[in-house]
Amino acid sequence: MRRSERLAEQLDWHWREHLRPRLDGLTDEEYFWEPVRDCWSIRPRGTSTAPMSGGSGEWTLDYASPDPVPAPVTTIAWRLAHIIVSCLGYRVGWYFGGPDVDFHTFAYAGTADQALSQLDQTYQTWNAGVRGLSDTDLAKPPAGPVEGADPFPMEGLVLHINKELIHHGAEICLLRDLYRWRD
């Protein structure tokens, strides 16, 4: 098995066996559920109370720059958008021929089903791109839109994205568990 296939399989096993099955049946109510006050989420345009919001469609993402300390609790909707745009979307566009996306130009999903469709498509493109990398590709820093955007070798970037998806996916699963047991 090539290195790129091992890297892709590390995340794909987690995706198939743990994360993606846990997202089945996600409802819109869960997607937007705010477990505490002042959560960041995806909201209809013009309704955000966050310092900033971005998005090109009817729905926008709450955020601030710089990030507040402590960071607000986020909804499943926000976490999925973060994975779709920040973790995967930028890099799919930069390195694997996908569309260019950023916080301000992305059309955020207004339903759980739409978000899961976006996630599935972006994940599949990322994973296929990783599987297609050669050992030479993995050893050198990727050529992104801005020099130094990802300053470590591509292999390090892939490992970082694997960690990010496992980490943020676990947060989403915890929010689902809390939702099920709410009062």
Where are these regions (language model features)?
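Acidic/histidine-rich alpha-helical segments that form the ligand environment
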Residues: 106-139, 156-166
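Short, contiguous alpha-helical
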Residues: 2-105, 143-183
